[in-house]
Amino acid sequence: MIVTEILGNIHEDSGRELVAGRHVEKVVLPSAELVKRIQRLRTDHDRQIGLRLPAGAPDLRDGDVVAVEDAAPSGAGHGDGEQDGTGAPGRGNAVVIQVLPTDVLVIGARSVVEMAFVAHSLGNRHLQAQFFDADSEYGAEVMVVQYDHTVQDFLDHHGVPYSRQERVMPVPFRHAEHTH
């Protein structure tokens, strides 16, 4: 099977409707693999899938539905049809992306001045960061970066509050290319 588009996301109503009543196979990926448009994937049922997204396609995200297959007609090699766990005939299969948690530092600076200092200092290292507001799952305004022991040392040295966590990030961290 070759996947050429993202059909929806199970974290949204339309994506949940796509997979409702279907057997869900998962493709488990680390965050770094989400940015690759062309790759070979393997489901948790050991099925191989080719991914060939067009240029300009968005990065993969946790919960993306990349394939939906209808159930084989009764008597077509599946006995009395696929089951969805309720005892009712199933609607077929769906393949969904599941992202592994990323080791991150969640930085909760105490003021906008402290956050600007941290962001500027880490920006000079060309480190990718994601920012979240108080309405996010973090419940506070925070900056999140991939774990790096030198960043942890920097934060400790300057007394900046942070916590090290494993998180499924909403968007992948990208490598920051830079030349002088």
UniProtKB/Swiss-Prot annotation:
Key words of the record: Chaperone, Cytoplasm, Nickel
Single GO biological process annotation from the record: protein folding
Gene3D superfamilies (UniProt xref): Urease metallochaperone UreE, N-terminal domain (2.60.260.20), UreE, C-terminal domain (3.30.70.790)
Keyword RNA-binding: no
InterPro entries: UreE, UreE_C_dom, UreE_N, UreE_N_sf
Record localization: Cytoplasm
GO cellular component: cytoplasm
GO terms assigned for molecular function: nickel cation binding; unfolded protein binding
Coiled-coil segments on the chain, per record: none
Region (Disordered): 71-90
Pfam families, alphabetized: UreE_C, UreE_N
Domain of life: Bacteria
Role noted for this protein: Involved in urease metallocenter assembly. Binds nickel. Probably functions as a nickel donor during metallocenter assembly.
Family membership noted in the UniProt record: Belongs to the UreE family.
Protein known as: Urease accessory protein UreE
Species this protein is from: Kocuria rhizophila (strain ATCC 9341 / DSM 348 / NBRC 103217 / DC2201)
